[in-house]
């Protein structure tokens, strides 16, 4: 049994398979998941697990070069946007409109669906390198 890091076998496998610039998405329970993209559904009920809890665990285990968010989060979910900026202080941040964000999710290696039920609580994590 693993002692550290992500215990979910699907998430651990996706993280281990990422190459430089590959992307994964951590999403609220309402984000549409495109056909053909791996869905890792963690949602058990509204709010559980939370977007921020899942983001923290994944971020602790992943080299992140860039973060993409929907620009709508700035005004519509101030708390989540602030927490993302506090948790992810090193990567570059990019904001795009929500429609562009959804287009970008089509290229993700996986989308991790949380139980989060607040607006625009979604992030695309772009893999960096550890060297």
UniProtKB/Swiss-Prot annotation:
Pathway: Carbohydrate metabolism; D-ribose degradation; D-ribose 5-phosphate from beta-D-ribopyranose: step 1/2. One of its GO terms (biological process) is D-ribose catabolic process. It is an enzyme of class 5 (isomerase). GO terms for cellular component: cytosol. The active site is at residue 20. Its EC number is 5.4.99.62. InterPro entries: D-ribose_pyranase (IPR023064), RbsD-like_sf (IPR023750), RbsD_FucU (IPR007721). This is D-ribose pyranase. The gene is rbsD.
